[in-house]
Amino acid sequence: NLNVVKSFPPIRVWGTIGFIAAMWFTNLTGNKASVNQFYFAGIASFILAGYALSLPKCPPSKQKGESKSIVQTFGLDAFKLLANYKMLLFFLSSLMLGAALQLTNMYGDTYLDFFKYFPKYADSFSVKYSTIIMSISQVSETLFILAIPFFLSKFGIKKVMLISMIAWVLRFGLLSFGNPTDGLWMIIVSCIVYGMAFDFFNISGSLFVNSNVPKENRASAQGLFMMMTNGFGAILGSSISGILIDKYF
């Protein structure tokens, strides 16, 4: 059996490396604000689908003679976890942090690019290559992913998640005071902090679910965790940020 805490991060880090490659490719080819990036993503998706279909079959484990209800088949039994106060608090935190994640993913690059409308910053490197600057966040993410086993063994999962929440405050605070020239260091530090903010909750959160949910419900619970962050959290974050931007910008 694999040690999930030690084995998962080195595998998960390759997703972030792909993220960085996509950001650099679209920026260096002049397509960071072009429809072409969607064509690139579509091609990459077809390649990924072909690779996925080539993988060995791995059917879900099922005991002989075992039957499942419709609720279990669709993974809806994971919602029973919300009756547990600890799990309810975790999933609500996932919802809020998912909203914050959506805000930085959707508007982080746009925010830095917006400085081009100010003559003082228009020709700065960080504005012309804003996507590359923001990709420092993902570079930081790769390093913190690999450091997760150490931090979990040193501080425990609760303290690691608390560090993540503090890091999110620093992320947005530094972005709000930074600028592309003399304040560039704040933006860069905010990108470095992002790695901690994201990994210490999202990756550690997956490990938290894995260690606190019975084996037969883990897949459904991981799906619920993903739905809270990238589903309901994404809807909440994109809706609120859209309203605020329309009102104040």
Predicted regions and their residues:
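Pair of pore-lining "gating" transmembrane helices in MFS-fold secondary transporters
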Residues: A83-T104, I192-V193
